[in-house]
Amino acid sequence: MAYKFVDNYRERGARKQLVDILKKKGIEDEGVLKAIGKVPRHYFFDETFWNQAYRDIAFPIGEGQTISQPYTVAYQTQLLHIKKGDKVLEIGTGSGYQACILLELGAKVYTIERQEKLYERTIQVLPYMGYKPKFFLGDGSKGVPEYAPYDKIIVTAGAPLVPEELL
């Protein structure tokens, strides 16, 4: 599949504005803000909706899933206190945006997605963008035990309770 992404002054300016909004909302981790300012969020949207990419809102990405609100991504990432080389398990790859933020911070990312269509798109788009987490298709409630232990675990998927396997 061929991708043709554009990232010009308009998108870069929109990312800068988004970073300013996140600062005003209390995000202080400079590494997180720098990562948000670098990762082109519009690449995770259908081109028709690129004008929505830098609003601080969640947005549908198909399969009944959404790309998380940028504030949520920044807040959760800030709470993780990522250090270069941290081994991070992400439950719920979704669009792949959160994985890219973690990779920008120097984490080794292991990400699992249960929706096959999202997984198939993400395993193509992220490497095209230069991001190479370890991808898995499956039930994230069980984690990815063959690569455990992890330094950090982030759950970006909804669940009625925290699975015992992740504790």
Where are these regions (language model features)?
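Class I SAM-dependent transferase core
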Residues: 1-89, 97-101, 105, 118-121, ...
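Conserved nucleotide-cofactor-binding alpha/beta core module
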Residues: 81-167
